[in-house]
From Swiss-Prot:
This is Apoptosis facilitator Bcl-2-like protein 14. PANTHER family: APOPTOSIS FACILITATOR BCL-2-LIKE PROTEIN 14, SI:CH73-248E21.1. Plays a role in apoptosis. One of its GO terms (cellular component) is membrane. Isoform 1 is widely expressed. Isoform 2 is testis-specific. It comes from Homo sapiens. GO terms for biological process: apoptotic process; positive regulation of extrinsic apoptotic signaling pathway; regulation of apoptotic process. Transmembrane segments: none annotated. Phosphorylated by MELK, leading to inhibit its pro-apoptotic function. Keywords: Apoptosis, Cytoplasm, Membrane, Phosphoprotein. A motif (BH2) lies at residues 308-315.
Length: 327
């Protein structure tokens, strides 16, 4: 349900001033138009992330080139679906995050069938919850015409974020039953229960957060699909996210970004875009109205990026958006 928790809401109040900030408007538009493209009950097996950068990708750009000089692939174009091996490019998705991937065997048909049956048990209720939560953002956007500046920024963020290759998926559209990721010394499975190496509650919480960090690399619809299958993980967030948890997750995502070889503008621009993407996807975990998590993202951006962005010419300047694109 989208009920609110008084104690959690008191932690980070969301007032009218927050709703009117450019940060919140970018987050709201990006979430609605670029992350969750399908309804919760219907998922396309096709990857929503583009599989690669363009032939001239970010890894080949000089430090002085602007975002507009990079030929970002359109996420829905046929050319952007072509797989390009970027394993040795330092600016690829895996290079930015320092992820070591190991693969295991595919799940058996019986196991997949059982997982699907369990998923359907609560899919309808989650779908209703998502529709109600999404309506909060839609209401915010419908009160007034969306600023073309906001649309241009959100679209550019999508171009930047979705240019990095996603975790490998099977040809049939399903995911391998066991994909082991190792990051910052933590190892875990992407499906099923989170293995706990120690009885310590703190260790368990750290592994859960690390798992979420990895799941955030999937497209929005794929992320929600995996969350539906992982009741154990979702059970840890029955009361929704707190800002402290949101901040920890976002901090860990950004810690995995390797900006070496990139200009400060590109590095900060990519990190800010990543925060927007992470915030949008975390709305799938929280049980409260979506604008609460977007409020978390607004606070995080204002505290960590907005001052620097304003000092360097604003969002359009940082992301390389021309006046023609805004108009």
């Amino acid at each position: 349900m989208c009920s609110t928790s008084g104690c959690d809401l008191e932690e980070i109040p969301l007032d009218d001033d927050d709703l009117n900030t450019i940060e919140f408007k970018i987050l709201a538009y990006y979430t609605r138009h670029h992350v969750f493209k399908s309804t919760p009950a219907l998922f396309s097996p096709k990857l929503l992330r583009t599989r690669s950068l363009s032939q001239r990708g970010l890894g080949n750009c000089s430090a002085n080139e602007s975002w507009t000089e990079v030929s970002w692939p359109c996420r829905n174009s046929q050319s952007s679906e072509k797989a390009i091996n970027l394993g040795k490019k330092k600016s690829s998705w895996k290079a930015f995050f320092g992820v070591v991937e190991k693969e295991d065997s595919q799940s058996t048909p019986a196991k997949v069938s059982a997982q699907g049956q369990r998923t359907l048990e609560y899919q309808d209720s989650h779908s209703q919850q998502w529709s109600r939560c999404l309506s909060n953002v839609e209401q915010c956007l419908e009160h007034e015409a969306v600023d073309p500046k906001v649309i241009s920024i959100a679209n550019r963020v999508a171009e930047i974020v979705y240019s990095w290759p996603p975790p490998q998926a099977t040809q049939a559209g399903g995911f391998k039953s066991k994909e082991i990721f190792v990051t910052e010394g933590l190892s875990f499975q992407l499906q099923g229960h989170v293995p706990v190496a120690s009885s310590s509650k703190k260790d368990e919480e750290e592994q859960i957060l690390a798992k979420i960090v990895e799941l955030l690399k999937y497209s929005g619809d794929q992320l929600e699909r995996k969350l539906k299958k992982d009741k154990a993980l979702m059970g840890h967030f029955q009361d929704g996210l707190s800002y402290s948890v949101f901040k920890t997750i976002t901090d860990q995502v950004l810690m995995g970004v390797d900006p070496r070889g990139e200009s400060e503008v590109k590095a900060q621009g990519f990190k800010a875009a990543l925060v927007i993407d992470v915030t949008a996807k975390l709305t799938a975990i929280d049980n409260h109205p979506m604008n609460r998590v977007l409020g978390f993202g607004t606070k995080y951006l204002k505290e960590n990026f907005s001052p620097w962005i304003q000092q360097h010419g604003g969002w359009e300047k940082i992301l390389g958006i021309s006046h023609e694109e805004v108009d």
